[in-house]
A protein has these predicted regions:
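Metal-cofactor-binding active-site regions of metalloenzymes
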Residues: 1-199, 203-345
Length: 345
């Protein structure tokens, strides 16, 4: 069997389906013309983004990312597709996988039925691929969800008997108007901690006033948690409980605070390059926080089906971005990164 990287801790379901699964699903749903259009767009995108120009990719190229997502959403239409899609993602992925998805009404199904289908996909994937482990995070979209939605997700995760849902994710379009911001964002983080649920938070994805404000709120909330937990737990209380996604656009003070807290950061190298968050002739922005692979850094694919990445590729790219002062072997690095998982193997 091909050597697989141990883990992928930043994987969004809808961006990670294989072409084979999407074609099969398009046949089932009678929309092969949509799949054909998706393949045309993917090929065009691949040709345009083989190598990053010095000034970065054009806006037209970046817009092809969002076009791919729109077409995927037209193909994946019902709860059966969600369940089968989870199995597909796990079958093409690494040995330990944390998949995120934003529950939604789909077809005639309710939000709760969506979550049940997501769970069933994880259960089936773990049964089929006994050499792997897949767990799920429920994503709160900061542009549509509220504190009450967070309570609902937390309640569902806590009462679920299956043990495959392990935490929350906060994501969503960083430049759109936000429904989860300020005090409400703080409340969601506090609710997760109060219920002993891990939380992954997308952060520093754009250079705006509200993003800077919310980043300060996130860092203050996790610092308060770290202080309150320090007397009860050996080691860093944030490890295995909190991960920060991307962390590209940050102030000097925010970078210093993350470094002080030793908060884990999810780095998705291909995604960062394709969105011009990292111009490859320059150092990666996260190296201004942590510059060595022995720091709390975790590679992720983000959207493997869209960006054409894989756990193995992202691990290698991530290594190339940071120093390795201690000359750690790959297995040592992977074991180190396993500390930041939200679930035990």
């Amino acid at each position: 069997m091909q050597q697989e990287h141990k883990s992928d801790l930043h994987c969004h379901l809808n961006g990670s389906f294989s072409d084979e699964f999407l074609e099969k699903t398009a046949v089932k749903n009678g929309c092969l013309q949509v799949f054909a259009e998706l393949m045309e767009v993917k090929e065009k995108y691949f040709q345009l983004t083989k190598q990053q120009p010095q000034e970065g990719f054009s806006l037209d190229s970046i817009n092809l990312i969002w076009k791919q997502f729109a077409l995927v959403h037209k193909i994946v239409r019902d709860l059966e597709d969600i369940k089968n899609g989870v199995v597909d993602v796990v079958s093409h992925s690494v040995k330990y996988l944390e998949i995120r998805t934003t529950p939604k009404e789909m077809g005639n199904g309710t939000i709760e039925q969506y979550i049940e289908s997501f769970e069933q996909g994880l259960i089936e994937a773990n049964q089929v691929h006994k050499n792997k482990k897949a767990v799920g995070l429920l994503s709160l979209d900061r542009t549509i969800h509220t504190v009450e939605d967070a309570r609902r997700y937390i309640h569902y995760i806590k009462k679920s008997p299956h043990g495959v849902l392990v935490g929350l994710d906060i994501s969503g379009n960083p430049i759109a108007k936000r429904t989860l911001s300020g005090k409400d964002l703080e409340k969601v983080i506090q609710l997760a901690f109060a219920n002993q649920l891990p939380i992954a938070i997308h952060m520093g994805e754009c250079d705006s006033g509200i993003e800077r404000q919310d980043t300060d709120i996130v860092l203050a909330a996790i610092e308060q948690f770290a202080i309150s937990e320090a007397r009860f737990k050996q080691g860093n209380p944030l490890h295995g409980k909190v991960r920060l996604g991307h962390c590209i656009f940050l102030s000097k003070e925010q970078k210093e605070k993350i470094r002080e807290l030793q908060a884990p950061i999810e780095v998705c190298p291909t995604c960062h390059s394709k969105l011009n968050w990292h111009l490859e002739k320059s150092v990666h922005p996260v190296t201004e926080i942590y510059n060595d692979i022995s720091a709390p850094i975790i590679p992720g694919t983000d959207d493997a089906g869209i960006f054409g990445s894989s756990g193995k590729k992202e691990f290698a790219k991530c290594k190339s971005l940071f120093f390795n002062k201690h000359q750690l072997e790959d297995d040592d690095i992977k074991n180190h990164q396993a500390k930041f998982r939200f679930s035990n193997p």
